[in-house]
């Protein structure tokens, strides 16, 4: 026999009806199951840090954290983010694998921070996707070449206090500069005194800084070291020669001053007998 809702009500006793009323509806059943399955806690999505927000720009997922007072790369960035803006913060370094959880990231803005250190694996996992990277207006004096190996990107390196060494020349062989930013790559106070204030691209066009795998500044240091070592070696040889000659003269003078010992009579008679 088919039981309709009206017939069910007619057969429902007060105790049974009270029990059925206490059962959760279908809309509340799923959260209840989630609570049971997660040990009593309801999982919640990661909330962006204060000052950050997610937006869709030109149909692409964008995560903006500009001027958010960040001192480290934040967590909670959606893994489908294509454009990430971390500019105008207080980031001092980028650790290894900082963005490897963002498999479709195409554009990364790290400009106007306090970046002084870049890990050689800072952009690990972005080799096939990253296209634009902004590192301008930071405190970068040198960057590891391996950080850019495999990346097909346009990069802005202007407004940093570069050492203008072999490492920078190698980086520029790995990447393409954003048009119009090359003149902003200027040698900082930590560079060789004769390079400070000069545009690096002009220097790199006139001088090979990586001859035989060594930078020009490194070669100058090596030459100075060799000259110093040569000077010390010459002084040591001169001292040894002087010491030998002085000892030889002293030996001669000692021999001349040595007294002649008299021959005893017994020795003379023995000598005569032998003869």
Swiss-Prot record:
* Membrane topology, record value: Single-pass membrane protein
Domain (LRRNT): residue spans on this chain = 42-79
Q: Which residues are glycosylated?
A: 156
Query: Per its UniProt entry, which superkingdom is the organism in?
Result: Eukaryota
Q: Which GO terms describe its cellular component?
A: extracellular matrix; extracellular space; membrane
Where do the LRR repeats lie? 80-101, 104-125, 129-150
| Signal sequence region | 1-41
Q: Which UniProt keywords apply?
A: Glycoprotein, Leucine-rich repeat, Membrane, Repeat, Signal, Transmembrane, Transmembrane helix
Q: Which residues cross the membrane?
A: 225-245
InterPro entries per the UniProt record, alphabetical: Leu-rich_rpt, Leu-rich_rpt_typical-subtyp, LRR_dom_sf, LRR_TM_domain-containing
Q: Where in the cell is it found?
A: Membrane
Limits of the LRRCT domain: 160-212
One Pfam entry for this protein is: LRR_8
Q: State the family it belongs to.
A: Belongs to the LRRC3 family.
PANTHER family from the xrefs? ANTIGEN BSP, PUTATIVE-RELATED, LEUCINE-RICH REPEAT-CONTAINING PROTEIN 3B-LIKE
Query: What name has this protein been given in UniProt?
Result: Leucine-rich repeat-containing protein 3C
Gene this chain is encoded by: LRRC3C
């Amino acid at each position: 026999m088919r039981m309709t809702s009206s017939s069910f009500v007619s057969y429902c006793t007060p105790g049974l009806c009270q029990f059925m009323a206490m059962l959760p509806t279908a809309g509340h059943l799923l959260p209840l199951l989630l609570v049971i399955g997660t040990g009593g806690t309801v999982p919640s999505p990661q909330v962006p840090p204060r000052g950050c927000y997610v937006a869709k720009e030109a149909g692409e997922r964008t995560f903006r954290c500009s001027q958010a007072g960040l001192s480290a790369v934040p967590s909670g960035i959606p893994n489908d983010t294509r454009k990430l803006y971390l500019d105008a913060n207080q980031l001092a370094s980028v650790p290894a694998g900082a963005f490897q959880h963002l498999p479709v990231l195409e554009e990364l803005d790290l400009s106007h921070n306090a970046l002084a250190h870049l890990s050689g694996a800072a952009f690990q996992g972005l080799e096939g996707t990253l296209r634009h990277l902004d590192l301008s207006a930071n405190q970068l004096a040198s960057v590891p070449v391996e950080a850019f190996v495999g990346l097909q990107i346009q990069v802005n390196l202007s407004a940093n206090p570069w050492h203008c060494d072999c490492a920078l020349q190698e980086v520029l062989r790995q990447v393409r500069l954003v048009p119009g930013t090359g003149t902003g790559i200027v040698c900082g106070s930590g560079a060789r005194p004769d390079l400070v204030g000069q545009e690096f691209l002009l220097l790199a066009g006139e001088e090979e800084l990586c001859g035989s795998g060594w930078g020009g500044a490194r070669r100058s240091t090596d030459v100075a070291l060799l000259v110093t070592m040569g000077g010390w070696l010459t002084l040591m040889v001169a001292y040894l020669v002087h010491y030998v000659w002085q000892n030889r003269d002293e030996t001669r003078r000692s021999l001349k001053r040595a007294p002649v010992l008299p021959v005893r009579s017994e020795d003379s008679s023995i000598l005569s007998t032998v003869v």
